[in-house]
Amino acid sequence: MNTNLAREEVVDVVDNVIPNIHALENTEVSNENILKRQSPYRYIKRFMDVILATIALVVLSPIFLIIAIAIKIESKGPVFFKHTRIGKNGKIIKLYKFRSMVINAEELIKSFTPEQMKEYKENYKLTNDPRITKIGKFLRKTSLDELPQLLNIIKGDLSIIGPRPVVTDELKKYGANTEKFLSVTPGLTGYWAANGRSCTTYEQRMQMELYYIDNLSLKMDIKVFF
């Protein structure tokens, strides 16, 4: 893809979901106000999370089985993968995912080219990651690799809608907004994930996640979901 065209696409996506992204840098909603707003909202949201996640697990159980078989056929190793993330109030959580990489994925980071390493350090992912299996590419493209996180929702680690959980190095990028980011339960999907997940910079991702938190409401969740 032409570099200039790619940049234009990023700008278009962000401008469409946040009319004036630069204005967000000066938008401050106190953590106290966010917590007050969560009081009735969080109980309704938690109830809906448990009900919808339980129904989804039952309905999607045949798909779970098909994916598990496909993973085992293509490569040796476990079907599921647990990834450490930071949840609400800084709690360490283990997210469940269908394994989409080869089993020695961490070791292969050492063989990245300088360009790949630069991209990985900046975005915590690669556009064309050589460690991803064939079935893994399909699972990631369709987000089916994250279906096991329905279990995390039932446990209370995640909500259906919320900022995507991050690792420690990513959290550092939030700087003065770290406390605000950690004040809400992370989600299976969210405002950023639904509106430009694959074509935004990390700075734009953070602004979109904080925009969601500043506008926390059932109305916002419905907007993201649909």
Task: Indicate residue ranges for each PLM-predicted region.
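N-terminal hydrophobic signal-anchor/signal peptide
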Residues: 1-58, 179
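C-terminal terminal-structure detector
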Residues: 2-13, 39, 127, 177-226
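Short, glycine-rich, amphipathic interfacial segments at transmembrane boundaries or analogous
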Residues: 18, 81-130, 189-209
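Hydrophobic alpha-helical segments characteristic of transmembrane helices
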Residues: 18-26, 147-153, 194
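Short glycine/proline-rich turn/loop motifs
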Residues: 28-38, 114-119, 129-132
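A hydrophobic, helix-centered structural microdomain
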Residues: 36-107, 218, 223-226
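Acidic active-site catalytic centers that drive phospho-/nucleotidyl reactions
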Residues: 49, 145-149, 209, 221
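A short, structured surface patch at a secondary-structure boundary
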Residues: 122-184, 225
